[in-house]
Amino acid sequence: LQSGDRVATLAWNDYRHMETYYGSACSGFVCHTINPRLFPEQIVYIINHAEDRYVFLDPDFWPLIEGIAGECTGVEGWVIMTTREHMPETDRANVLCYEEVMAAQSADFEWPELDEQAACSLCYTSGPTGNPKGVLYSHRSTVLHTYATLIPDAMNISSGDVMLPIVPMFHVNAWGNPYACPVAGAKMVMPGNKMGDGPTLAALINEEGVTMSAGVPTVWLNLLSHLRESGERVELSLIHI
């Protein structure tokens, strides 16, 4: 891989996705987050249009990718973000295990000096007309947005907060939370593929002492429905939604 190359992700909110966010962008590559809710032909289009060389994906999405991988002509490897024992069965030769790739790397890495105007991440719209449109974010714009989200009249995230980011990391970079929380020193609780599941959200809020969360109204309706049906309560730690 060379500086400026595109590295795509097709994943939920989890720690391996966070590692890929930072590992790719801070190495000089462009992290391209793919929305799995797009139609398969749209995913093929944006992978080819972005010229993604590698795609990092959660095992959940392998059935989707296996059906379209042959049409993604520029992809050199599909990295499944799991351990060897949880790898899906496939006959494709260019499928790699994330944890094996990580284990094979040296612990010593010299981070490059990057131009602040260079591209950091890439998102595609899901607009109503034509194919999705790509939007590049620079390192500078990402840093400025991160600072802006931390001010009191915005997210006001601090080192004492525990953030549960439910908005997907493939949706405008989870509204900047993957960058803002580490800068502030806030703890992040990652819901994985259960980000819309009421019982899981209630358990995470109570067990981890979540103080802040970000998500669309549908998610909160799912949580509210679960609480009403089960009689369960969430702790008063959650003060900012």
Residue spans of the language-model regions?
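Conserved AMP-binding
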Residues: A11-D14, N35, I157, I166-H171
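Conserved small/polar residues in nucleotide/adenosyl-binding loops
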Residues: T125, I239-I241
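Conserved AMP-binding/adenylate-forming
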Residues: L1-E41
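Conserved AMP-binding/adenylation subdomain of ANL enzymes
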Residues: V143-V162, V172-T211, L221, H226-L227
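Structural core segment of the AMP-binding/adenylate-forming
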Residues: C26-A103, N206-G209, V216
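Conserved adenylate-forming
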Residues: L1-Q2, Q105-A118, L122-L164, G176, ...
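Short hydrophobic alpha-helices that are characteristic scaffold elements of the AMP-binding
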Residues: Y22-S27, H49, H171, P182-V183
